[in-house]
Amino acid sequence: MAELDKRPKVLVVGWDGVRDDTLRQMAPEAISEIASRGRWWTTTLPDVDIAPTMTAVGWSTILTGVWPDRHEVLGNDDTYHLLHRYPDMLTRAFCARPDIATYAATSALIFGTDFGPGPVLGPGVRTMTWFDRRTYPGGFADTDVLVADDAERRLGTQEHDFSFVYLGETDSAAHAHGVGSRYEEAIARQDARLARMVQAIRARPTFDDESWLVMLTTDHGHRDEGGHGRGSWQERQSFVVAGLLDGSPATWATEAANVDIAPTAWAHLRVTPSERWLCQGTSLLAP
């Protein structure tokens, strides 16, 4: 089937608090396989004179396609923001084209409650799975298992065109143990969960009729001893990995920023952004 005749689908996977230098040194199998079908970019977050390297800030930037000085999420606890003007990329896609089926699976408070700037994911996310990590003894270590199970099942059997899956164990590991062996073990578990999602997608009976773009990113890095929020290079480092599962040839941008994830997803889904969206990113896929 010709590429333009295939139904486009997008999966964005978020790993919280993953340092790009650590990830590149480990070169986990699943994320490396995605990169081999596209590209792996190192990205840099704004300095602290713009916004701290915090979870809510990073994910708001990724999901809206605008920088913190525009969406004005400037901390995890902030209730003042402009997300009503800059909704998430799934909501944008759904509002532009209601035939696009959207799905998200997460367990962080900012996605499923009104904590701080939440919920960062808006009403255009038509299927939402959220587990409250506060009710599980292991926190993200427990809920990531449930999130990955839900994503594997839905991605393999249901018709979701634009999906976002968030996994948070890596951030918890860095906070508790610093950037070391325990952190790397958590990254390896996230990569195994990614592999299961990709395997489920490939096993879809309609896979040959679909064009799947998979992207991965993180909201911030960590200091060596664990912790973030300041402006060190360790905390400001991030990454974007993107690849087409069917191996279709594509021309990719040479440089990337985290605000480019949203317009890349829209471009693959054939959603034309309105000028009123004021998106600050550009598609990483050449037209």
Where are these regions (language model features)?
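Feature captures the catalytic ectodomains and active-site-proximal regions of enzymes
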Residues: 1-287
